[in-house]
């Protein structure tokens, strides 16, 4: 009697999930190429922003062309892969960068992040009637690092994808406006800062890293260098902010469960991973070529996550809260421009 052994195919659920992940990866690869086109780069649109826009267009107009079973892979990319990518984003930060801007740069970063989060959360809920998640996601995008911060907050809050999408929209609109506005008001003589203070102001108040570089590069290289370092200092504050958010959510959950203390602590493990990898990067123990390769791969995975979020978002959901979210984005932008000016004046 002979026995034949054949290779069994993957179980259907896993095969469908893998197909969904690969589909998003192919879309993300196209997005990266699209974001690299000169006419898109000049506006400072990162692959993350282009990814969510392309994902939303596909999800709302062409979703029927994707097998429904692949949705599990899209969801996995928008949740699990997202968290891994946020953790590896820590390789973009180092203690040396934070030290380079000194106490004034750190003080401005802390002041801007804390005040913007507070204003956004309170104004969004009490003045504009937004739900907690949408208000906090929008505030995070303005306060810390644009789309990447929205991505980091979303799994911690367990927010719906469309809430992240509208928050990212404010980052795109007002961050892009900054790239044109800041050089204009500087050359008009309305920003009486030296190079160091000007770099701190731009890095401390513009939404995304690419937008910071876009705004500062229209002034001079020295300002661009300072602005980029200060911006990365704001990014580094993502970890303590997420940890505080986790403890606050636990306290809220405990209060809502008749004071029971066993409520699950939603401290995001990827925030710890972010911190560990930032320390690893500071120690300079990994080959520079390896770090560069991981950073590029991480941007690609983040682009996949944003694309997947876009696919899961529906325009009808955005229209429901769109005007109020944009109003909150405008309030926060006014605070960044004028309040940020005051904070820089005090710190420098």
Swiss-Prot record:
The terms describing its cellular component in GO are: plasma membrane
The source's domain of life comes to: Bacteria
The record's principal subcellular location, in a coarse class, is membrane
**What stretches pass through the bilayer?**
20-39, 43-62, 98-120, 135-157, 164-186, 196-215, 235-257, 267-286, 299-318, 322-344
Give its localization: Cell membrane
Which Pfam families does the UniProt entry name for this protein? Cons_hypoth698
Membrane topology annotation: Multi-pass membrane protein
Q: Which UniProt keywords apply?
A: Cell membrane, Membrane, Transmembrane, Transmembrane helix
NCBIfam families the UniProt entry points to:
YeiH family putative sulfate export transporter (TIGR00698)
Describe the family membership recorded for this protein in Swiss-Prot or TrEMBL.
Answer: Belongs to the UPF0324 family.
According to UniProt, the name of this protein is UPF0324 membrane protein BP2808
**The species this protein was found in:** Bordetella pertussis (strain Tohama I / ATCC BAA-589 / NCTC 13251)
């Amino acid at each position: 009697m002979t026995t034949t052994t054949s290779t069994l195919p993957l179980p259907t659920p896993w095969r469908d999930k893998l197909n969904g992940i690969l589909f998003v990866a192919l879309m993300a690869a196209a997005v990266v190429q699209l974001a690299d086109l000169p006419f898109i780069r000049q506006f400072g649109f990162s692959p993350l922003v282009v990814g969510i826009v392309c994902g939303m267009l596909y999800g709302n107009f062409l979703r029927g062309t994707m097998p429904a079973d692949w949705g599990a892979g899209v969801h996995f990319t928008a949740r699990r892969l997202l968290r891994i990518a946020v953790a590896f984003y820590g390789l973009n930060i180092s203690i040396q960068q934070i030290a380079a801007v000194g106490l004034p740069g750190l003080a401005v970063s802390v002041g801007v992040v804390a005040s913007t989060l507070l204003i956004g959360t309170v104004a969004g809920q009490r003045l504009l009637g937004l739900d907690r998640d949408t208000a906090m996601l929008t505030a995070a995008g303005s306060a810390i690092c644009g789309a990447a911060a929205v991505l980091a907050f979303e799994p911690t809050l367990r927010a719906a994808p469309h809430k992240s999408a509208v928050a990212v929209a404010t980052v795109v609109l007002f961050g892009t406006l900054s790239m044109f506005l800041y050089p204009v008001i500087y050359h008009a003589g309305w920003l009486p800062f030296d190079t160091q203070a000007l770099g701190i102001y731009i890095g401390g108040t513009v939404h995304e890293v690419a937008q910071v570089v876009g705004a500062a590069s229209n002034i001079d290289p020295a300002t661009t260098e300072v602005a980029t370092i200060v911006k990365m200092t704001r990014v580094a504050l993502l970890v303590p902010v997420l940890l505080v958010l986790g403890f606050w959510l636990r306290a809220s959950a405990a209060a809502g469960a008749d004071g029971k203390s066993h409520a699950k602590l939603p401290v995001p493990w990827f925030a710890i991973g972010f911190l560990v990898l930032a320390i690893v990067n500071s120690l300079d123990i990994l080959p520079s070529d390896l770090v560069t390769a991981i950073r590029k791969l991480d941007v690609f995975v983040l682009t996949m996550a944003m694309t997947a979020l876009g696919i899961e978002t529906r325009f009808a959901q955005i229209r429901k809260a769109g005007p109020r979210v944009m109003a909150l984005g405008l309030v926060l932008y006014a605070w960044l421009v004028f309040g940020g000016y005051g904070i820089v004046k005090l710190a420098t």
